[in-house]
Amino acid sequence: MTRIDSVRAATGSAKDSVLHAAEVVAPYADTAKERAAHYAHEARVRLAPKVTLAAEQARVQYGAHLAPRLEQARTHVPPKVELAAQEAALRTRKAARQAADYSRPMIEQAVAAAGPVRDEAATRAAAALVALRGQVTAEDIQKLVRKHERRARTGRAVRMLAVLGLVAGGAFAAWKWWDKQANPDWLVEPPEATEVPESGRLTSVDGSAEAVLDPEVQAKEAAEEAAKRDDQA
């Protein structure tokens, strides 16, 4: 016997037991119902005159004792106290109206905000019902869960990269500002000038042959060479 057969057999036996219990209890239930109706009718017949008499007596006593005293107390109340009571009642009604006018937009806003939540809950309930009916497998549910987890991880990574980029940009900007403050342009020393050799013939740019110099330059070079020869002699 399979599990389904055993469940069906247990369900059938439970159903038979319930039907048998209902058949056994039915006569007692009918008898109890009849007795309850009889007792209720009897109590109503016996208590109705007493209740009516008590109500009449209370009405008479109120008219004879309490009503005159209330009227007398009302006449002895100072006008200022009565006016204050009336003003308090008016203020209470005004405050109630203001509270209603103030709370109505908030309630409407809360209801409007609860709409998407209600729709989401209905969607999830429908999805759960479909899953219970077997139209969605456990594998599909696991895929959805993994998809949501991937989205959450991607969102966290993007937020982390954005924060790191902002921090790095701020640090670079701060470093540039500090470097500019520590080393201003006017404080930077110019590079040293390179020395030009005292003598030597000028050559062409490609170094292939000597360039044709100006006669004055040639005369100056000749004088310098003659002076060097005299010194060496």
From Swiss-Prot:
InterPro entries reported in the protein's UniProt record: DUF5324
Function text: Seems to be involved in the regulation of nhs expression.
GO molecular function ontology, one term from the record: DNA binding
GO biological process assignments: response to antibiotic
Signal peptide limits: none
DNA-binding region residue numbers: 93-112
Name the UniProt record assigns to this protein: Putative nosiheptide resistance regulatory protein
Species of origin: Streptomyces actuosus
Biased composition, class Basic and acidic residues, residue ranges: 217-233
Transcription regulation found in the keyword field: yes
Stretches for region Disordered: 190-233
Keyword DNA-binding among record annotations: yes
